[in-house]
Amino acid sequence: FGVQSVIVSFDVVETKQGEYCLYARNGMLKRMYEKKVPVLSKIKLLDSIGVGEYLITSVEREGTLKGLDLNLIKSTSNGTSSPIIYAGGASDLEDISKAFSCGAHAVSAGRLFTLHGGFKAVLVSYPKRSDIKSILNDKL
């Protein structure tokens, strides 16, 4: 096993001051000991001890289909060479493409692919392979 087998997951909430803070229990509990620690500082610390990948979830956007937090992606992806997977709010394939342009290595999307129509009925659907290839710039 290598460093890629060690993944740390963060639940993140943006404060009124525009700072991204680590939260627990779906954003209901702010970690008191991390009150003043920006997410990027924590990533740098974890990089130094060998964490190989991160999963960062924007709690406020999770399940909303209102778009990924592109500011969060830009601010965290530039601070590490480790891959980061982003979750929370993916609204369509264009939104995922924007995330890649901002530095995301991968994007997690649940509701985008399961709930459809006016009644938000469960209907698992996937984009066409050609659409995926265009987002990934024909890397497949």
Regions found by a protein language model. Give the residues of each.
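Short, hinge-like loop/turn segments at secondary-structure boundaries
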Residues: 2, 24-27, 72-74, 102-104, ...
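C-terminal helical cap(s) of enzyme catalytic domains, especially alpha/beta-barrels
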Residues: 96-140
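Charged helix-capping and loop-helix junction motifs
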Residues: 36-40, 66-75
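Conserved anion-binding
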Residues: 1-55, 60-61
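A cross-family glycoside hydrolase active-site/sugar-binding cleft signature
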Residues: 7-11, 57, 85-88, 108-110
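Short Gly/Pro-enriched loop/turn and capping motifs at secondary-structure junctions
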Residues: 60-62, 90-93, 113-114
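Catalytic cores of alpha/beta
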Residues: 71-109
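Short, well-ordered secondary-structure micro-motifs
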Residues: 18-22, 65-67, 96-98, 119-120
